[in-house]
Amino acid sequence: MSRHADTATLDLFADTASDAALPLKPATAMAALRTLTDAGLLRHLDTALAALLHQQAPETAPCVLVACALLAQMEGRGHSCLPLAQLLPVPLALLGPAEGEAQASVLATLWAQLPPRLADWLAALRACRWVRQAEADADQGQPLVLADGNSPQPRLYLRRYWQHEQAVAQYIRARCQNEPVQAIDTAAARGWLARFFPALPDGARGTPDWQKIACALALRGRLTVITGGPGTGKTYTAARLLALLLATAPQPEQLRVALAAPTGKAAARLKQSIDDTLGALQAQVGADLDLNALVQRVGAARTLHSLLGARPGTRHFSRHAGRPLEVDVLIVDEASMVHLEMMAALLAALPPGARLVLLGDKDQLASVEAGAVLGDLCQDAAAGCYSAATADWVAQVAGEAIAPAFQARGEAPALAQHTAMLRASRRFGGPIGQLAQAVNQGDAASALAVLRAAADGSVALQQGSTPAQAVQLAWPGRAGCASYADYAQQLARWPAVEQAAAEPGFEHFHAAWVRSVLQAFERFRLLCAVRAGDWGMGGLNHAVQAALVQAGALPAHAAASAWYAGRPVMVTRNDPLLGVFNGDIGIALPSAPPGHLLRVYFAQGEALHSVAVTRLAHVETAFAMTVHKSQGSEFAHAALVLAAGSGPLLSRELVYTGITRARSAFTLVEPQPGLLAQAVRQPTERASGLAQALVGQSGDG
């Protein structure tokens, strides 16, 4: 919209506002919404939804049109609903800051002419035929749903997300009924747990042993949520849980186990961790339990899209309630990345008697799409809230005492009886662990102190730097830390590999080289808070690529070509036909002689999967990636690049997630002082009704 149009809208508002007897007209409200869209405060999609409602029902009250646009905007930012009680006191907090006086005036004038009382908004919503009152009306396909309209916290939903949220709550409640999957020999279970978790003299697992408690809780139920920070042993615990289920199964040879994660990278890490842990445990238990056979039977971990059978071009899956998964135990890692719609589909596709184990860090970033399911499920995780019956069960089966501080003082929530929070980190200590803890606790001063005081170089702060200085972390790199120099060194081996692989019987040289390039690339990553701008993913990808071309590490034509040898890419759209999924990382490399055709190679566990570059349309260069996309990955050195003007994207969870991607070294790039403190003070809050739907479900143990 032009500046003249902005002024015309303001004049129209001023004329309306000058006569208090004239109510705000729907057409005027739509004009204001379009102005907010052109200001960047709303998306065109948001306004289009309100416009459709206005077109189909011209009598719709202006406040309903505004609520509809705001609801669409909230969903686009990861919320599953619009919390109406929070809308009136702080409307601008939902939109973000206005750009310029004209937009600020439109916002202020619009809000001044909308009903000041929540009751008036609710009355208008109830009067709209497009809105279903969840507690009163029959479902007639209305696109909007008003939930808890008579409570102090009413919420407005798009119909699809209301249905997903209700489905997840229903499935979770059903799985929390404590109906044993099988009869349990508690004495045998206790014996196996004692062998799987032998007492450690230094108390390395903590007191009580929450890993052991998690296994005991999982043994009796069809749902277990295991949360904890990095290094607390979530997959270590899950592997021992699998061994326990095998040892106590009536017919162990028929136990069907599946592993899954939201991304291919996370799935591969889950499988590797489970296999390694079970292999070590096999040596510990000897011939009494055949864990090697279990490893072979489990097979490869899969992405959730692959597991459920994503149908190309649709939001539907081939696995659902009418055609459930053929599985007895499903372990899902990186559950914080699972959005509301995916969780609903997953729960629907599970057989009622199957066990579901969710692993994840509740403090990480939630999924990009709507919902913060793991966070909602873990609302009581830190407090414990265990019933007396649950504490008795844990003591009987695991020999562990749950302290009174972790027991419920009143009615015990049912979900809490199926949730375990691992509290002792064995791997994630030192400055990186201290930094993550300070950020997670909202202590910006301590976080800065850790960054500035680390003598071993494991953490570092680049303050007041330029994008060029951030690029130097990638090439040539920070002293003593991984960078893309390792990846460039492996790329440079191609001429020798090409010559060797051309010889009969030495074709395996090419595959070994591809693996070495992929592994070297995964040692470092630039992580960005935003996508656009010099400090964003796009700008830094371009700058790193240019630096590598200038250094001779990439071919000279890389700057002008869509594809070149060495280009790392991230898949941005699921393509089951090609066997690639959103978030997969691959590198374009020459195929084995004599072809020499560029193909993108992906590591899928121990195997390599390749796709011709001409068939990959939905990819983006991946020298730098957003923190959201990095979830499920781990790098020897991770560099987190903050950006001014990031608004709500710059959050505590974003910084925590970036830090916890680092295994050995972490660098924070802060273009201007104060960005870290701003982020740490700003925790992410996702509007959702899932937690409320689960409250009040008491567990009887």
Regions found by a protein language model. Name each.
Residues 531, 584-701:
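C-terminal accessory regions
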Residues 351, 562-565, 581, 630:
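Residue-level recognition of short, solvent-exposed, well-ordered loop/turn junctions
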Residues 573-578, 644-646:
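Short, charged beta-turn/beta-strand-edge "cap" motif at the junction between a beta-strand
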Residues 203-219, 513-514:
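Pre-Walker A adenine-sensing motif
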Residues 213-215, 219-453:
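ASCE P-loop NTPase helicase motor core
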Residues 363, 367-569, 575-577:
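Conserved helicase motor core of P-loop NTPases
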Residues 186-209:
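N-terminal pre-Walker A segment at the start of P-loop NTPase domains
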Residues 3-16, 23-185:
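N-terminal accessory nucleic-acid engagement/regulatory domains that precede
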